[in-house]
Design a protein with these regions (language model features):
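Short, Lys/Arg-rich flexible segments
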Residues: 1-199
Length: 199
């Protein structure tokens, strides 16, 4: 049993512990937000123009654009108004192949955060900004509490996620998760400093 003389001291300790818990919770939330933000930012967005199947078409279209631009460099090809003379411009291109209705950004919008269990869901909504992933993750991280959560998972469950992590995309040749994991401790240090300095 504690004496009443110790109550103020114990209350001060409890206040410190509660304050420290709140700081840690906020630092963990901020760290999670930094990790998720980096994963989303590094996530490639499908660009059919750079797909292997479209390399010939893309190269041809670029050559046509460059040819037309070169024509403009010769003053003999221009009218008095500075426009390209009729009949000189090449009006040709090859179609870029893509699945019907394809819009890039599905992978970027499929990052999920889970507390103590790995998320299993996916969605079919393209979002090249990644705002959907960030919003969902923030909502999960907001409920993080010290002592109630042992693990935080960052997951992208699309079937091609592993291929992208293994460098399948020129936009993210080193993947996303491995590189972000290397910086996780630094993100925590930054977040802890922000919390302690009231930023």
């Amino acid at each position: 049993m504690t004496s009443s003389a110790n109550q103020p001291f114990l209350a001060a300790i409890q206040l410190f512990v509660d304050g420290s818990k709140q700081e840690i919770e906020e630092a963990v939330r901020r760290t999670g937000i930094k990790i998720l933000g980096r994963l989303v930012d590094m996530s490639p967005v499908g660009q059919p123009e750079i797909w292997q199947v479209n390399q010939t078409a893309s190269a041809y279209n670029t050559a046509v654009r460059e040819h037309n631009a070169a024509l403009r460099d010769d003053p003999a090809n221009l009218t008095k108004a500075g426009r390209l003379r009729r009949g000189l411009r090449v009006n040709d291109s090859m179609d870029i192949k893509r699945p019907e209705g394809y819009v890039g950004g599905r992978f970027k919008n499929n990052w999920y955060v889970g507390l103590d269990s790995q998320p299993t869901e996916t969605n079919d909504i393209p979002d090249a900004s990644g705002q959907g992933s960030n919003s969902r993750g923030l909502a999960v991280l907001e409920v993080f509490r010290v002592g109630q959560v042992n693990s935080i998972y960052f997951t992208n469950n699309l079937p091609y996620a592993q291929a992208l992590e293994n460098g399948h995309s020129n936009q993210a040749p080193g993947g996303m998760v491995g590189l972000t994991a290397l910086d996780a401790a630094q993100y925590f240090r930054e977040a802890m400093s922000e919390v302690r300095n009231g930023r």
